[in-house]
Design a protein with these regions (language model features):
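P-loop NTP-binding core
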Residues: 1-252
Length: 252
């Protein structure tokens, strides 16, 4: 049975979507089968994996609201073994439409169940909010990766996210665990980055991934080409960091 990992942090611009794209590509490069679920209405994971959003006929939105078969929403990517369920801007209004649906917190869990055995890993790119779709994503997940940006206010809002995870674990998904805190945009030359690294390690200890994602221009450039960094520049620090992260997750 495939492992479902949500990537969540309601603080924006922490590298959540970038990590989803590049971790998925790295796992696939290591011959794992991967499904990325883009649960963010901005659909950046979709475009970052080369999906032409204008040509998408069935997205996560249709699966949630219209009960469309999830298999109709799965698209292949340029990487063998890496598929995606794309997002759509309509997902912005989906939370209101979901309010009257039965078992509204478990819709994503239920729609992924038929394809769970088809993949080694399912990665859910959560919206940068703690709304109903993120609650759905965490309810569906076995574990959650929390990216933490090595910049000012890095830990801002994490206590709120951890409280949400605690509530979901108590009421909706007792198996939910923290896969790890992932330090992103790390620059060892900066005192601030090292201070944040030390602070996160002190707070969360063994829950912090050994791998850190260094600040790297290739990571920033790759989405503009609709490619994960491992295809854009396999020799870059960004590609090597995400490959190391994938290996760390596989070996857990």
């Amino acid at each position: 049975m495939g492992k479902i990992i949500a990537l969540a942090n309601q603080k924006g611009d922490v590298g959540k979507t970038t990590t989803t794209i590049n971790l998925g590509a790295s796992l696939a490069t290591l011959e794992k089968t991967v499904l990325v679920v883009d649960a963010d209405p901005q659909a950046n994971a979709s475009s970052g994996l080369g999906v032409n959003l204008q040509e998408v006929e069935t997205s996560l939105y249709e699966c949630i609201i219209n009960k469309t078969d999830v298999r109709d929403a799965i698209y292949t990517t340029d990487i063998d073994g890496l598929d995606i369920i794309p997002s759509h801007i309509d997902l912005v209004g989906a939370e209101i439409e979901m309010l009257n649906l039965p078992n509204r917190e478990k819709i994503i869990q239920q729609l992924l169940e038929p394809v769970r055995n088809d993949y080694d890993y399912i990665l859910i790119d959560c919206s940068p909010s703690l709304g109903l779709i993120t609650v759905n994503s965490l309810t569906a997940a076995d574990s959650v990766i929390i990216p933490v940006q090595c910049e000012y206010f890095a830990l801002e809002g994490i206590s709120k996210l951890l409280n949400t995870i605690k509530i979901i674990k108590q009421k909706l998904n007792p198996k939910l665990e923290i896969e790890g805190f992932l330090l992103t945009m790390y620059d060892s030359r900066l005192r601030l980055a090292n201070q944040i690294y030390d602070e996160v390690k002190r707070h969360f200890q063994e829950l912090v991934f050994k791998t850190v994602i260094q600040r790297n221009v290739k990571i920033s450039e790759a989405p503009g080409h609709g490619l994960p960094v491992i295809l854009y520049d396999a020799d870059s620090a960004g590609a090597k960091n995400h490959l190391a992260l994938a290996k760390e997750i596989i070996n857990k």
